[in-house]
Amino acid sequence: RQVAEVADVVELGVPFSDPMADGVTIQEASRAALADGVTLDWILDLVAGLDLGTPVVLMSYLNPLLTRSHGELASQAKAAGVDGFIVPDLPYEESGPMRQALVPSDLALVQLVTPLTPPARRRRLAGASSGFLYAVRRTGTDGRERARRHRRRRRRRTRGLRRRAA
């Protein structure tokens, strides 16, 4: 219950073997989670055992969700205590079947907008989004800039070590 005091919503990521929109950190976390046997079913079981007092949404690429029908996904997610989904690689124009399957279970399908989303499309996505609208801070992969800074720092340290060794 303490989570509800500091968070409006909890986002849990479903690992995927090819997280193309994610940066190095999340890619490595996905690989490690998959290697440890984390699956959509594992995450649903985890959520079912939690009592956070705040909504839980699953961030997932579409492929892991397609291991079952949209209707099965909705009923299993609702039974586990999930409140919605963020599916970054599911374009709004193709989201109708999933959205329709989630509505009877009162599950949200959160849409994403970026700084480059045209205003008319942003309004359309805001109207179609349920739960909340996910505003991506910048375009590109998550964690890219942080990873770049980390590599630069590592190179500087390595150069310093090479100079001392010479």
Feature map (PLM): residue ranges:
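Active-site-adjacent beta->alpha loops and helix N-cap segments on the catalytic face
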Residues: S17-I26, A35-A48, L65-E72, V87-P104, ...
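Glycine-rich phosphate-binding active-site loops on the catalytic face of alpha/beta enzymes
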Residues: V9-P19, A80-I86, P91-E94, Y134-R144, ...
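Short amphipathic alpha-helices and their capping/turn segments at secondary-structure boundaries
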Residues: R1-V10, P119-A126
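A structural motif corresponding to the C-terminal end of an alpha-helix
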Residues: V6, D45-V56, A80
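Active-site mouth loops of central-metabolism enzymes
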Residues: R1, P55-S69, A108-T117, E145, ...
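Active-site cofactor/substrate anionic-group-binding motifs, chiefly glycine-
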Residues: A4-F16, A29-L40
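Glycine-enriched alpha-helix->loop->beta-strand junction motifs that scaffold or abut catalytic
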Residues: V6-A7, A77-G84, V103-V110, G127-Y134, ...
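N-terminal small/glycine-rich loop or linker at the start of catalytic domains
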Residues: G23-A29, L50-M59
